[in-house]
Swiss-Prot record:
GO MF annotations in UniProt: DNA binding; DNA-binding transcription factor activity; DNA-binding transcription factor activity, RNA polymerase II-specific; DNA-binding transcription repressor activity; DNA-binding transcription repressor activity, RNA polymerase II-specific; identical protein binding; RNA polymerase II cis-regulatory region sequence-specific DNA binding; sequence-specific DNA binding
Quaternary assembly: Homodimer; homodimerization reduces DNA binding efficiency. Interacts with TCF7/TCF1 long isoform (via N-terminus); inhibits WNT-mediated transcriptional activity. Interacts with HHEX (via N-terminus); abolishes the SOX13-mediated inhibition of WNT-mediated transcriptional activity via competitive inhibition of the SOX13-TCF7 complex.
The keyword Plastid belongs to this UniProt entry's keyword annotation: no
Compositionally biased tracts (Polar residues): 305-315
Annotated DNA-binding residue span(s): 424-492
Record organism: Homo sapiens (Human)
Start and end residues of each stretch annotated as Disordered: 27-102, 274-344, 581-622
Disease cited in the entry: Autoantibodies against SOX13 are present in sera from patients with type 1 diabetes.
Keywords: Cytoplasm, Differentiation, DNA-binding, Nucleus, Phosphoprotein, Repressor, Transcription, Transcription regulation
Protein name listed in UniProt: Transcription factor SOX-13
Length: 622
């Protein structure tokens, strides 16, 4: 007992682990006691790589410590390694066993806090140092390097995937650009093809329009009236009435024999010229005076007959001749074209005008001669008198120029005061600027197309154009207007003078002239009454306008009986000139010149207005 207290004091003072009853072996065993709790403490700290060793270190020091506390009483270190000291003799141990245990427990309670203090300071330092060393070791371990390498691999993989994505996006953009370019090329190609198709369609339309115009011209040529009443007598220059001289073929001169009337009235377009040398030799003097009046044939052509030698042409062309020449003028009163006019079903306007003119002529001639046979005999005699024909031709040809200069009914013929060499043209408007090139293109494609057809096509195209398409041409119009204003600052637009006509020494406008002719026709209708005569053939108005006997063969005695002797003045009858000449040779050829002059003067006075009125009607309707 007295020996244990100094042991505890000694332990408390120096802490060296020396005991009186223990050998040096106990001191050597103390060092593992100091190491044991350190190992246990360190083992208590969880190590990631060695869990089995930590559990063994933490379990081993507890078992020998308990064995030391229970089985040995002389060991100074309560936490021994498990090997007990050699026991004392059993006499002392048996005597003081229970009391020693109590003292040991009490001393243990006093010693343990001091030991814990000593162990805690040393143990904490070593534990902290070891932890720092272990932390330093952890930074450079293979696992951390593997983790870092894994992270780097992941980053490399991500970068490679990002690069692939960028490359694919770039290639897609290139493909999209190529596709867009191809689409644009396709659209441009489609647009070009559409424009070509539109151009082809326009050309086809122009061709169809040209064909339609040609067909219309052919139809008009077939249905046109055979009696043409121009406003002016034709000049010596070839007139552009129609390019085909075949239009004169259907209207052939009536043969010498009346038996051939129906053959010539039932006309056909390719009707040949009558091949009768005797008849042609007989008719040749009759055709020469009327050659300047032929509108469809060339002048001085002996083959072509007198196609348009209607009474209206004779009267209108011979108006200004002086009354000094002798010989009557109604030489073609019964001209062949008078009957085909009604036979073809021409409108009532021209036919009625011709009938009115004939009524006026008969009204004036009836007052002078007294009977309808006398002027007809004058016609028959005048056909045979060649000096009279020469005088008539001279009187008709030379006053033609005077008539052309005196009468300006056609507005496009003579404008000497406004269309001189110093005439300033107006600046072109937008339509004219556009139509200039378009007209040239159409003429290059279709050189035979008529100007009126081209104008219709251009007008329809201009109307179908939008304002945006017309804008550059309006700008060109403004530029031309400014240029024209700079070039001609004092320019003023002077419109063409209105059409006038000199009638009885007075210059009348078109409206006044028509009104005058209308009143004259009405007065002539009211003042003229035909008394019925016995033995004459009475015909209705429908027979006069549309003679039904046109295609009927008539007996030769009947024709010879009715035509020369009892001819109705209002009845348009085709007269056979050969038969008339045969009958007229035996008649009296004595007529006073005064009567002829008076007859011609009265006829010319009324026929001038009437025939010009009829000619004006035809020109305006066309």
């Amino acid at each position: 007992m007295s020996m244990r207290s100094p042991i505890s004091a000694q332990l408390a003072l120096d802490g060296v682990g020396t005991m009186v009853n223990c050998t040096i072996k106990s001191e050597e065993k103390k060092e593992p006691c100091h190491e044991a709790p350190q190992g246990s403490a360190t083992a208590a700290e969880p190590q990631p790589g060695d869990p089995a060793r930590a559990s063994q270190d933490s379990a081993d020091p507890q078992a020998p410590a308990q064995g030391n506390f229970r089985g040995s009483w002389d060991c100074s270190s309560p936490e021994g390694n498990g090997s007990p000291e050699p026991k004392r003799p059993g006499v002392s141990e048996a005597a003081s066993g229970s009391q020693e245990k109590l003292d040991f427990n009490r001393n243990l309670k006093e010693v343990v806090p001091a030991i814990e203090k000593l162990l805690s300071s040393d143990w904490k330092e070593r534990f902290l140092g070891r932890n720092s060393m272990e932390a330093k070791d952890v930074k450079g371990t293979q696992e951390s390097l593997a983790e870092k390498e894994l992270q780097l691999l992941v980053m490399i993989h991500q970068l490679s995937t990002l690069r692939d994505q960028l490359l694919t996006a770039h290639s897609e953009q290139k493909n999209m650009a190529a596709m867009l370019f191809e689409k644009q090329q396709q659209q441009m190609e489609l647009a070009r093809q559409q424009q070509e198709q539109i151009a082809k369609q326009q050309q086809q339309l122009i061709q169809q329009q040209h064909k339609i115009n040609l067909l219309q011209q052919q139809i008009q040529q077939v249905n046109m009236p055979y009696v043409m009443i121009p406003a002016f007598p034709p000049s010596h220059q070839p007139l552009p009435v129609t390019p085909d001289s075949q239009l004169a073929l259907p209207i052939q001169p009536i043969p010498c024999k009346p038996v051939e009337y129906p053959l010539q009235l039932l006309h056909s377009p390719p009707a040949p010229v009558v091949k009768r040398p005797g008849a042609m030799a007989t008719h040749h003097p009759l055709q020469e005076p009327s050659q300047p009046l032929n509108l469809t044939a060339k002048p001085k052509a002996p083959e072509l007959p007198n196609t348009s030698s209607s009474p209206s042409l004779k009267m209108s062309s011979c108006v200004p001749r002086p009354p000094s020449h002798g010989g009557p003028t109604r030489d073609l009163q019964s001209s062949p074209p008078s009957l085909p006019l009604g036979f073809l079903g021409e409108g009532d306007a021209v036919t009625k005008a011709i009938q009115d003119a004939r009524q006026l002529l008969h009204s004036h001639s009836g007052a002078l001669d007294g009977s309808p046979n006398t002027p007809f005999r004058k016609d028959l005699i005048s056909l045979d008198s060649s000096p009279a024909k020469e005088r008539l031709e001279d009187g008709c040809v030379h006053p033609l120029e005077e008539a052309m200069l005196s009468c300006d009914m056609d507005g496009s013929r003579h404008f000497p005061e406004s269309r001189n060499s110093s005439h300033i043209k107006r600046p072109m408007n937008a339509f004219m600027v556009w139509a200039k090139d378009e007209r040239r293109k159409i003429l290059q494609a279709f050189p035979d197309m008529h100007n009126s057809s081209i104008s219709k096509i251009l007008g329809s195209r201009w109307k179908s154009m939008t304002n945006q398409e017309k804008q550059p041409y309006y700008e060109e119009q403004a530029r031309l207007s400014r240029q024209h204003l700079e070039k001609y600052p004092d320019y003023k637009y002077k419109p063409r003078p209105k059409r006038t006509c000199i009638v009885e020494g007075k210059r009348l406008r078109v409206g006044e002239y028509k009104a005058l002719m209308r009143t004259r026709r009405q007065d002539a209708r009211q003042s003229y009454v035909i008394p019925p005569q016995a033995g004459q053939v009475q015909m209705s108005s429908s027979d006069v306008l549309y003679p039904r006997a046109a295609g009927m063969p008539l007996a030769q005695p009947l024709v010879e009986h009715y035509v020369p002797r009892s001819l109705d003045p209002n009845m348009p009858v085709i007269v056979n000139t050969c038969s008339l000449r045969e009958e007229g040779e035996g008649t009296d050829d004595r007529h006073s010149v005064a009567d002829g002059e008076m007859y011609r003067y009265s006829e010319d006075e009324d026929s001038e207005g009437e025939e010009k009125s009829d000619g004006e009607l035809v020109v305006l309707t066309d």
